[in-house]
């Protein structure tokens, strides 16, 4: 899988094709994070082939839909449990991110795993994604934003065009630290 662009959350439901021995096969539902529906279907079959003894040729997808974010304007803390294959073996990991949507947090996770651990998108498997309370956060990079009196520096100021001359004899200085 290529984790291109912002990843979206899809709910994919599939089953084995009905047969004489099994007229009503059970349904299997998964939450898949992918850039589009085609990749979501592909990942569904990949995971199902690992878990159950059937594949795309002996099964069918009943439904696929994109899960919309419940509150896309409220920032949330996300806990992500994942498994990834590195050059030295398979590792389990828990990571925390702050974002507006689940898809945004998972996209951040894929980018972060690629940067910090050189993990490719196809070798990362998201086990669980959960919204966590501020009191339950463990990672300092997430906890630093829970301060109500947090202040951000303004490292670069932009000159307003009203006060600028038409011609200048030197380049403007925008750094005031």
Swiss-Prot record:
UniProt-listed Gene3D superfamilies: 3.10.20.10
Keyword Ribosomal protein: yes
Pfam (any one): Ribosomal_L18A
GO CC term, one of those recorded: ribosome
UniProtKB keywords: Ribonucleoprotein, Ribosomal protein
Gene Ontology molecular function terms on file: structural constituent of ribosome
Top-level lineage group: Eukaryota
Cross-referenced InterPro entries: Ribosomal_eL20, Ribosomal_eL20_dom, Ribosomal_eL20_eukaryotes
A single GO BP: translation
Matching SUPFAM superfamilies: RplX-like
The family this protein is said to belong to: Belongs to the eukaryotic ribosomal protein eL20 family.
Name used for this protein in its record: Large ribosomal subunit protein eL20
Naturally occurring in which organism (per UniProt): Spodoptera frugiperda (Fall armyworm)
């Amino acid at each position: 899988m290529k984790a291109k662009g912002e990843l979206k959350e899809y709910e994919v439901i599939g089953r084995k094709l009905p047969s004489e021995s099994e007229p009503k096969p059970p349904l299997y539902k998964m939450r898949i994070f992918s850039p589009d529906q085609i990749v979501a279907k592909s990942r569904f079959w990949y995971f199902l082939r690992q878990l159950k003894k059937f594949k795309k040729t002996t099964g069918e997808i009943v439904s696929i839909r994109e899960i919309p974010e419940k509150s896309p304007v409220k920032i949330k803390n996300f806990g992500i449990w994942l498994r990834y294959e590195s050059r030295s073996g398979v590792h389990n990991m828990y990571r925390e991110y702050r974002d507006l949507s689940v898809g945004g947090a998972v996209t951040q996770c894929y980018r972060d795993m690629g940067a910090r651990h050189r993990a490719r998108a196809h070798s990362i498997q998201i086990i669980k994604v959960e919204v966590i309370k501020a009191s339950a956060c463990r990672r300092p990079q997430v906890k630093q934003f829970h301060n109500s009196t947090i202040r951000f520096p303004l490292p670069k100021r932009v000159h307003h065009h009203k006060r600028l001359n038409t011609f200048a004899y030197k380049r403007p200085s925008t750094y005031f630290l």
